[in-house]
Amino acid sequence: MSRHVTVVLLLAVVLLLSSHMSHGQHWSYGLWPGGKREVEGLQESYSEVPNEVSFTDPQHFERSIPQNRISLVREALMNWLEGENTRKKI
C-alpha cells in the first residue's frame, strides 16, 4: 500500500511542477512584458478590419429530430419489436 501512496505523491509533484513551468510568458514579435503591444502595430491591425458588417437573413433549418420523447421511445420500441418478429420467422 505504501508503494501506491509514494507513486501517487510522485505523480502529484510532477503534475504540479509541469503545470507551473508551462505558464511562462511566450514572447512574440511586437510584444513587451505584460502582454503590451506597440501602438503602431495595433493601429495597422485595426485599419485592416472593415468598418461595416453585412448582415444576412437568418436561415431556417428543418428539424429532423422529433421533439417529443415519447415518440422517440415508441419508435425505438417498434423497431425492437419488428426485429424480434423477423428473428422468430427465420
Curated annotation (Swiss-Prot):
Signal among the record's keywords?
yes
* Subcellular compartments: Secreted
Residues making up the signal peptide according to the UniProt record:
1-24
InterPro entries in UniProt: GnRH, Gonadoliberin, Gonadoliberin_I_precursor
Annotated TM spans: none
Which residues in this protein are found as Pyrrolidone carboxylic acid? Q25
Single GO cellular component annotation?
Answer: extracellular space
Which molecular-function annotation in GO is an example for this chain?
gonadotropin hormone-releasing hormone activity
**Highest taxon, organism lineage:** Eukaryota
Q: Where is it mainly found? A: secreted
Residue positions where Glycine amide is found in the record = G34
Q: In which tissues is it expressed?
A: Expressed in forebrain but not in testis, ovary, kidney and liver.
Q: Which UniProt keywords apply?
A: Amidation, Cleavage on pair of basic residues, Hormone, Pyrrolidone carboxylic acid, Secreted, Signal
Q: Briefly, what is this protein's role? A: Stimulates the secretion of gonadotropins.
> Family per UniProt?
Belongs to the GnRH family.
Name under which the protein is recorded:
Trp-8 progonadoliberin
Instruction: Give the species this sequence originates from.
Output: Rana dybowskii
